Regions:
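Primarily heptad-repeat coiled-coil rod domains in cytosolic scaffolding/tethering proteins
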Residues: 6-9, 13-16, 54-57, 61, ...
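Immediate post-signal-peptide N-terminus of mature secreted/exported proteins
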Residues: 3-56
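Generic low-polarity alpha-helical segments
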Residues: 1-3, 39, 127, 139
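Extracytoplasmic electrostatic interaction patches
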Residues: 68-139
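Structured domain cores in non-transmembrane regions
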Residues: 40-80
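Generic preference for well-ordered secondary structure
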Residues: 2, 19, 23-26, 50, ...
Length: 139
């Protein structure tokens, strides 16, 4: 079991990272829903004030991009959680040698980094767009 301790530590770290990713997904969903509401209000504001609409096109593009990705992200999170749990069980049963464990762990570490980066990207864009809407409405 001593040879698997580092692997188990990495699995535990991945499990914690996936917990954080799930929270980020909730944050992205909340920000997305809020931005959809703000988008409708902002669109009316721009229409009434004859303001150029490139900002609306950018806002809609971010919303559409997330809409296209959100199910994939959610599915990838569920899949990664399942993979980590299966890997933990398989390592405990001694099913993989060190090379295989390393390969699987690197694959899951890369997958979680990608998920986290996607969610960070969307959260950042949503927050900036929300700030922009508030700024324009105050003008």
């Amino acid at each position: 079991m001593a040879c698997t301790e580092p692997s188990m530590k990495r699995i535990n770290a991945l499990t914690k990272q996936l917990d954080r990713i799930e929270k980020k997904q909730e944050k992205a969903e909340t920000a997305f829903n809020k931005l959809v509401e703000e988008c409708a209000h902002f669109d009316n504001f721009l229409r009434e004030n004859n303001t150029p609409k490139p900002e609306m096109q950018l806002l809609r593009a971010y919303l559409q991009q997330y809409e296209d990705e959100r199910t994939i992200i959610a599915d990838d999170i569920v899949y990664s959680i399942s993979q980590i749990n299966d890997l933990k069980d398989d390592i405990a049963k001694g099913l993989y040698d060190e090379t295989q464990r390393e390969e699987y762990l690197k694959s899951e570490e890369n997958a979680t980094k990608t998920l986290e980066a996607k969610l960070d990207y969307f959260i950042d864009r949503f927050e900036k767009q929300s700030e922009f809407i508030k700024y324009v409405e105050k003008q």
